[in-house]
């Protein structure tokens, strides 16, 4: 039998516990970085790695230019380090030399970089950009049209090029990969195989073209860390050689999938990172 006084004390403690304000959980980095609508305006600096980092001094790619349009403006992801913006403007001019009006530019980075609330694992340090495979039909699209229009795939059935793929795609991606600022370009393996088959000149740039799933509607350009960003972490260079056999193997594996390998039990998507798990300079950038 519990004494009445003890029973009353236990009841009071339970009531207090139920009404107490819970300890505030650590904010997720994606929510913190995703809340900023503008850059800090400081000196340009890429901080950390492509999938765990941030960016000081990002600049905004203008929504429209003579040879480009930024798409999906509602996402506010048309930000990047100055060298990325310069690269994209230059590549859009190259596109006009092969018969396109210019380029549709997809996601780049957020104003301060960092993890995003939706989508990408990378694109965090202002050095990544997605470029649509769809040749622009107009460079005077309204903001509403840029939300509704979609890119198109250059791959059919996962194993062959679609009717959209063209020599112009090859020339634009080759020009991008030939830029010394570019570390690698991610494309669907079918696109890489088509480039491997068609290339009759210098094949050195093909090393930078990396096959990966989910990149048939756009290609993803990644720049190397630049001088002035000592805290930027480059990836290891791509494997030696042109990588064409590797891309062909990707397609063979789609036709005849090998047994699935074990998943990495330690993998976490960057959207799950707490702010304290980001580089200290990134925590300082957002004032935490």
Where are these regions (language model features)?
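Bacterial N-terminal signal peptides that target proteins for export
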Residues: 2-10
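Active-site acidic/histidine clusters and adjacent loop/turn architecture
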Residues: 34-36, 40-106, 168-172, 179-182
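Catalytic cores and adjacent binding grooves of peptidoglycan-active enzymes
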Residues: 26-29, 141, 145-288
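Extracellular/periplasmic catalytic domains that process cell-envelope and extracellular macromolecules
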Residues: 96-98, 122-127, 177-178, 212-215
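Extended, low-complexity, intrinsically disordered C-terminal regulatory tails
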Residues: 28-41, 87-118, 186-208
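Sec/Tat signal peptide C-region and signal peptidase I cleavage site
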Residues: 21-25
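Bacterial N-terminal signal peptides
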Residues: 9-19
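Short, surface-exposed glycine/acidic/tryptophan-bearing loops
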Residues: 118-136
